[in-house]
Amino acid sequence: MDLQLPRGTRDILPEEVSKWHFLETEFKKVCENYQYEEIRTPVFEHTELFERGVGDSTDIVSKEMYTFQDKGGRSLTLRPEGTASVVRAFVEHKLYGEVSQPIKMYYNEPMFRYERPQGGRQRQFTQMGIEALGSDDPSIDVEVISLAMEFFRKIGLINIKLVINSLGDKESRLKHREALVAHFEPHIDEFCAECQVRLHKNPLRILDCKKDHDNPLIQSAPSILDFLNEESVAYFENVKKYLNALEIPFEIDSTMVRGLDYYNHTTFEIMSVEEGFGAKTTLCGGGRYHGLVREFGGPDTPGMGFGIGVERILLALEKADIKIPAKKPLEVYVITAQPEAELKAVTLVNKLRQNGISAEKDYLKRKFKAQLKDANRKNAVYTIILGEEELQTGNYQLKNMETGEQEAVSETTILEKLINTKGEN
């Protein structure tokens, strides 16, 4: 019997959770400042949702999904990415009928992919992302990109670069597809078995192949930018114009197609350029999709979004030596100098907590010095000492653990004093 963690998963222990809270809080603040509202979707969906939405020619669907049959014989899959579920909810609940458009949502949820575990990549991972549904204006593309860049600025990640591309509209992609087939077909035997299948199914996926990434034929493949029609060129030019207006620097990479089949027009990645973190490590990726809502049974509705892997962001912060703010400090540790003070300690700690002051006491019946050491280990700002004299007089010893200053404060005023002190800080 194996009772240890499954490969590709991890426990987030209490001392680490504050780092996650920091990222979640900052992401929430930025999203809500941009008027995005949170959505929460099920951990598992019908398998067909991802086959149709993500694309059955992608690595995610063909290799990486956790799929199982339930007791009713239904094929279900743990969600491998966030967009398909959000769009499914958008269609199922007819959010496209809302008066206020676009519908702007964010999420922060666990995802599951059967991949080889490595730094910043697990089989269960957490993804933060946004989706804006209902606008085909290029300014919403730039808003989505701007939100991601603002989030990275807020958490201190500045050694990053934005890379963009355009996959054009359907007409542009069909012409590019024909050119790719003509380019690769005479040499298809030089590619992996998967790419040989992709040639006529979805040749764009060959550009994204991990095995054949260094093949010179990929480097010399026809560029999508040479096949953009007039409308697609104008759209991409507007995206670049808005980015320049916001003074967001960017590079263009015509080979960047992303790992999902639903993208069209704008795609982008935000990469770390932090020394020692690995070349072109992607921290955020996203793009525009116009056919997904219709694919799921809704009306033609354009969308734009991105996803960010939390584990990878934490690794990037560590590599950049960025200190995450510590968790909320323990404000008061109540020390009992004798057993008779225990009841008073319980009631005092409870009263402090009810008034918004974090408080703790000893639960192991330790001696006075051991309790004091415990207060130090927990970095308590103050200690309140309850002994025989304090119980008789109702005056408690309040000690500032940083300065060592100690004063007697009456039971009736100690709460007011602590609240006032907290307000000053």
UniProtKB/Swiss-Prot annotation:
UniProt cross-references to InterPro entries, sorted A to Z: aa-tRNA-synth_II, aa-tRNA-synth_II/BPL/LPL, Anticodon-bd, Anticodon-bd_dom_sf, His-tRNA-ligase, HisRS-like_core, HisRS/HisZ, HisRS_anticodon
Class of the enzyme per the UniProt entry, highest EC level: ligase
Keyword terms of this UniProt record: Aminoacyl-tRNA synthetase, ATP-binding, Cytoplasm, Ligase, Nucleotide-binding, Protein biosynthesis
Location(s) in or outside the cell: Cytoplasm
Pfam families linked to this entry: HGTP_anticodon, tRNA-synt_His
A cellular component annotation (GO) from this entry: cytoplasm
Superkingdom per UniProt: Bacteria
GO molecular function, one term: histidine-tRNA ligase activity
Catalytic reaction annotation: tRNA(His) + L-histidine + ATP = L-histidyl-tRNA(His) + AMP + diphosphate + H(+)
Enzyme Commission number: 6.1.1.21
Any single biological process term in GO: histidyl-tRNA aminoacylation
UniProt xrefs under CDD domains: HisRS-like_core, HisRS_anticodon
Xref: HAMAP family: His_tRNA_synth
Assembly mode: Homodimer.
Family classification: Belongs to the class-II aminoacyl-tRNA synthetase family.
Protein name: Histidine--tRNA ligase
Record organism: Listeria monocytogenes serotype 4b (strain F2365)
Top-level taxonomy: Bacteria, Bacillati, Bacillota, Bacilli, Bacillales
